[in-house]
Regions:
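Noncatalytic, helix-rich "gating/capping" subdomain that lines the substrate-entry/channel surface
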Residues: 1-79, 83
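Zinc-dependent metallohydrolase catalytic domains
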Residues: 78-208, 217-376
Length: 376
């Protein structure tokens, strides 16, 4: 019992360290350095901005949207989402491994997707949340208690479909299987993911792949278990489900083979859902891009063909730098594959990528046509 008490006390201190005085903050950072390898602590203003977003993100979001998110960006994004939905339906119709019965169920689910773009239609009001200039720690306690009460108040009530799981400034996107919705906060609708004035190759290769990725989550190893209404229910024929699992096993083996650090490999099972999302998403985005005027042309821009610009735009999204310690931690805990493997994992299975860059037998990333995997 005494050991359990000590453990619980330690957890409280560890969870609260960032809200306490400097010695606690420094001790917490020193502990995290061992896991992440981070040499210098994130500047205080960035840490406070992140915490503010986490506590009152929709208040902060209103300011962010007013300053940085233009109406034309939302309109352009809605157009992209609609075009990718059309492309996805075409791809479902053309699948050679799925029966007509399961195809229809898949299309029903696709048609039922609810897209959310930029910011909520109804802003959270934070009524009853007490924030003062007297105590940072108490503010965070109050915020935690308020959030808990808000969640409990939703019990036994109809689902509020106006709520968002991310704040507007968030640079991310998500798919919710129980809501069957795809959500794109304003924060991700900027370079390198999106630019309203950019050519189609750039936008379809970047944010288009993200849109397709989130759509594909509705049909990955987890999302595929939910129907169009968000109910956990099997809608596959026995034969189609077996074929789907066989294909995902091949994708898992592909990522298992990637060596990240010494003997540490990517975990193909842990990252399965995200890898299915990447493979499906890039294919759907490319299908949609080829329906545009630029996608059907051969005109070069800055010396690159439309198809090359599409794939280069996808690649640029995954530029980054990560310390070995953080990379090792990611491999063991994160369902996302490291960026350097996400950037090659999907294209090596696409005939269009080989044609765009004239990839031939003997080249490092070459895969035989019969070994290139197509799921969605």
């Amino acid at each position: 019992v005494e050991t359990l008490k000590v453990y619980l006390k330690w957890n409280i201190l560890k969870g609260s360290a960032s809200y306490l005085s400097s010695p606690f903050v420094k001790a917490s950072f020193a502990y995290s350095q061992v896991l992440s390898g981070q040499k210098v602590q994130t500047p205080r203003w960035q840490r406070m901005s992140s915490l503010t977003d986490g506590v009152i993100g929709e208040l902060l979001g209103q300011l962010y949207v007013a300053r940085y998110f233009k109406p034309e960006a939302k309109e352009r994004m809605a157009e992209l989402v609609a075009n990718l939905r059309k492309a996805f339906e075409i791809r479902i119709n053309n699948l050679d491994w799925m029966s007509d019965a399961t195809k229809q169920k898949a299309k029903d689910k696709l048609h039922a997707f609810t897209p959310k773009i930029g910011y909520p239609d109804v802003w959270k009001k934070y009524e009853g949340l007490d924030i003062s200039a007297n105590s940072f720690y108490q503010n965070m306690r109050n915020a935690g208690a308020w959030s808990y009460k808000e969640n409990v108040a939703q019990l036994n009530k109809p689902i509020d479909r106006t709520k968002w799981g991310m704040t507007p400034p968030t640079v991310n996107a998500y798919y919710s299987p129980v809501m069957n919705e795809i959500v794109f906060p304003a924060g991700i609708l900027q370079f390198p993911f999106f630019a309203a004035e950019a050519d189609d190759a750039i936008n379809y290769g970047a944010i288009g792949a993200v849109i397709g990725h989130e759509m594909s989550h509705g049909f990955d190893d987890s999302g595929s278990q939910y129907d169009k209404d968000g109910t956990l229910r099997n809608w596959w024929t026995k034969e189609d489900l077996a074929k789907f699992k066989a294909k995902t096993a091949i994708l898992g083996a592909q990522f298992d083979a990637y060596i990240v650090l010494d003997t540490i490999h990517v975990n193909g099972k842990l990252t399965m859902g995200e890898n299915i999302g990447d493979l499906g998403g890039l294919n759907i985005a490319y299908e949609a891009f080829k329906m545009t005027k630029q996608g059907q042309s051969k005109k070069k821009i800055d010396g690159f063909t439309p198809d090359q610009r599409f794939f280069l735009s996808f690649a640029q999204v995954w530029r980054g730098s990560i310390l070995p310690e953080a990379l090792a931690q990611q491999i063991y805990t994160d369902p996302h594959s490291p960026g350097q493997y996400r950037v090659i994992g999907a294209p090596v299975n696409m005939d269009a990528w080989y044609k765009a860059f004239d990839i031939k037998p003997g080249d490092k990333l070459y895969k035989k046509p019969e070994d290139r995997l197509k799921i969605w």
